Structure formats: C-alpha cells, structure tokens
Amino acid sequence: MSLVVLTNIPTPYRTAFFDALAEEAARAGRRFHVLYCAKTEPGRHWPYVASKMRHAHTVLRGFHPSLTGIHAHLNPGVLAELNLLKPDTLILAGSWNTPTMLVAGLNIYSPPPRRFFWSEGHADAVLHKSGLIAWLRRRVYRTFDGFAVPNAKSAEWAVAQAGSPRQVVTLPNAIDAKFFARPSAASRQEARRHLGLEGEGRVLVQVSALTARKGVLELANAFLGLSAAERRGAKLLLVGEGDLRSQLETLAVGSDGAVRVLGQLPPEEVRRVLWAADAFVLNTRLDPNPLSAIEAAAAGLPVVLSAAAGNVREVVEVPQTGFVIRDAADPSEALRAVLNASEVQLAEMGARSAELARTQFDAPAVARSLVKQLYP
C-alpha cells in the first residue's frame, strides 16, 4: 500500500517536508512517492538538486505553457506512472485546474485510490467567487474524496465548494524549525554586524515577492509615513524579487537608510536576516497560507501579519505571537504597535512564536500527524 503526492514543482519547503513524510510513511509500513510536473516554473528561483532529496520521486515529462502569468502543466504520462505505483491514497497538490491534476482524476485501475486535494484556498483569497470558473471549480471539488488543509478557513472553504461533507485532514505548511531557530543571543548581534545594522533601532523584515499582492508598497509608504519619533531609528528590510522592486528601491534611496531592499536571497541568507530582525511583517493583501510567517516564528520573532492571510488565526491571534494588520492598505497601526512594544513584550511573543513553530509546524511533527490521520 502506498501514498503518492502529485504536485507542480519541488520547492525547498516542500521537499524538506516530503523527506520527513517518507520517513514517517516507512515507519507505518507504507511506500511513499512524489510525482513532480516539472523541475521549476517561471519566477521560481530554487534550483532542482535531486541528490539532496531523500524521498522517492519522479519528474514527469510534459509541456508547460504560460499564459498571462498562469503556468500550466500537461504531463501525458501521469496515468502510466500512477498505474505503476498504484497508490491507495493520492494527494493532489497545486492548482485545481492544472491539466495534469485533472487527468490524474481518471480512474484507470481498481480499486481507485482515495483522492485528496491539498487545498490552501479560502473565501478571502479566492479570485473568482462567481461565474464560469467558480462553477467549474465546484464541479472539480466534488470529485475529491477529501481535502488536506492548513487551517480552519481552508477547511470551511473546501467543504463548501464540494457541497457535501468530505474527510478533512489537517496539513499545515511544514518547515525545518531547527534550521531557522536562532542558536544563541550572540547570533543576533553577529547577523546584525554582517548586515551593517550595528547600533541601529528596531529592525523589521518582510520576506515575500515584491508584488502588489504582498502589499509591499503600502508597507514601505506606511513605515516612512511614521514620524521620526515613532520610528526611533527603526529599519525596514525587504527580501524578495518582483515587479515592484524598482519602485521600492526608489523609495529606499530617498529614505536615508530607513528602507533597504535586499532582493532575492538563498535560504541561509534569509535565515541570517531573520536572526538580525526584531519582528517580522507580512502586509499581504491576498494569501491563502503564507509560509514565511511560520519561518519567522521559528526564528523566534514576533509576527505582524495581515488579516488577509489564511493562517493569521493559527499563527498570530490564538497563540498571541504578535500583531494583526487589519487593513493592508494602511498597516500604520500595527507598525506603531510593534515599535511601541517593550523589549519584554517582544521577547515573550518571540518565545511563543518559537514554541508554536516547533510543536505545530516542524516537518517531522506535521508528517507524523498526517500519516496518523490518513492511516489511523
């Protein structure tokens, strides 16, 4: 008996989780295999290094057309691969309308596998709430036996789209908590020295695509709109790449060093920036389940997260690990809150963040939970 995941491309956070899931599946006496539609997609900057992946996997041959920013995958051999693997459980991860995902729904062997859709969408993040696309989405959702979801918002959304009760398993985005955990108090100062931040005020960081969807311009403008007395020498670091980078760099040039655009960084450098920071910010306008906030929590940072994020309740509100941005168009109130918080308050929030990441989002814990839910 085996568990198979069909997903679009290998990403660092997914491959680390799949490595952990392979180990947990083996302990439960289950084979585990991942089918990838492609090695990468436009705009994705992670290299594919098969030697670093400890889970059995296959990169399918196929066609990968792009249209108006949508990257589709058509892998004609997916059914043949599934016929060879014959999973008892198949998890489909990615866009519901990807041609390969739709083809994988055809039952070519008996008994067919249980089919779960790994759904991170929710009502606040969906682009098409009505019309033809919404109708097609509901039709596809009704074909699934169940859903793997990261949070309560996504669970409610998926079942509503299906139109009737389905099995729901909890599958939050998993991280390597040990990788991001700050090893010592001295590491913060070392990271600050490396980034030229010695002796500065508080350091806030947002790690995201530099796009309108992530609210980066609104964040930078709101930060610069605070008075000098409110900022008290604070710095805002922006890590990532996107079509708004040039506008952000123009703001940074005129900010007298208050805003810095660091661009796309490898995971080790992102970690160093998190270690140097006092708090993490994500001013997203539309985000089903942002992983960067969880990685920041693992680094022991207070999290300032937009209410539009699907996991805001699980990551910030319930565990009280930071502050909520109620309106991504103007995050000033939340910025003032984190800048006015005492060192003791920030330390307490950071400690709760680290504990949350370790117990709820660390890859081995998430993998163990998923296997138990699928095979009780």
Model-derived features with residue positions:
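Conserved acidic donor-binding segment of nucleotide-sugar-dependent glycosyltransferases
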Residues: 317-329, 337-343
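A short, histidine- and acid-enriched strand-loop-helix "catalytic/donor-clamping" loop
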Residues: 95-99, 113-131, 143-146
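Nucleotide-activated donor-binding/catalytic signature segment of Leloir-type glycosyltransferases, i.e.
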Residues: 246-268
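Conserved donor-binding/catalytic core segment of Leloir-type glycosyltransferases
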Residues: 4, 198-214, 220-224
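Short acidic/histidine- and often glycine-rich active-site loop of Leloir-type glycosyltransferases
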Residues: 170, 308-319, 323-324
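Short hydrophobic beta-strand element within catalytic cores of glycosyltransferases
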Residues: 302-306
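Donor nucleotide-sugar binding/catalytic pocket of nucleotide-sugar-dependent glycosyltransferases
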Residues: 138-188
